[in-house]
Amino acid sequence: MLFSAIKVTMQNRLSKYFFTLTNNKNNRSFLKLDVSLQKTIRLTYILNIETSTKNCSVSVSNNGKLVGIKELNNGNYSHAEVLHPFINDVLNEANITFDKLNAIAVSKGPGSYTGLRIGVSAAKGLCFSLGIPLISINTLASLAHSISIEDGTIIPMLDARRMEVYSAIFDVNYNQIREIKAEIIDENSFLNELQNNNVYFLGDGAEKCKSLITHANAVFVDSKFPSAKEMCVLAFDKYKKNDIEDVAYFEPFYLKDFIAVPQKKKL
């Protein structure tokens, strides 16, 4: 005799899952619930912090899906003033409290020395106080994930002052195929990549390269900054792999040493 199929519903998901159970004691069996359902039995909330550029961005994700975001790019580094209010705002938007967070993810760099310090300090403080793991995200990888292409390569660039940028190269599947570099851009930059296929340049370092990189295969994507939105999937993937940092010893990836600029004397 076959019992009626039982409908299983979890976390307001639309998908329906069924199992059947036989009354034969020697052949009692059931169909396993779908793997995707098993993964949603526990909700994983991650707070994502991005402060590597002028864009101060904070998001909350649930199993890799964006459920709250707040960001501001007003041309100034106002991260110290807005970061903590933004954190409270996104938690309210996601309708959760700090104790529901499973991890904190932070953009590790490269980028602004001051911006990275602010974001990492906040992330580490939360991890210590909440007793949850810290996840670091490659800033350029996160930026690369903000666009989708069918062919060619992606070169995210972050401004490193004057004609220097922080850059890396990614393929269509977001695999990093060249290490991160601090490099001075000239008319010969990325010629090998440009000769083969389209190259998509993006980030706040790409704008100043337009006048130098004029190859027909060069495509410049406007107005792209690293955002906590793209961190959601990346952070959840690392969380599932237990790819976490030592909170006590973690430091941002500056790539270059910080050089203080002397202030001008007031007359």
Which ranges hold each PLM region?
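Glycine-rich phosphate-binding/hydrolytic loop that grips phosphoryl groups
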Residues: 221-254
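DPxDG-like acidic metal-binding loop motif
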Residues: 103-134, 139
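Surface "functional belts" at beta-alpha junctions
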Residues: 41-42, 65, 133-226, 254, ...
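Short hydrophobic targeting helices and cationic amphipathic motifs
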Residues: 4, 19, 28-31
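N-terminal beta-alpha supersecondary unit
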Residues: 41-108
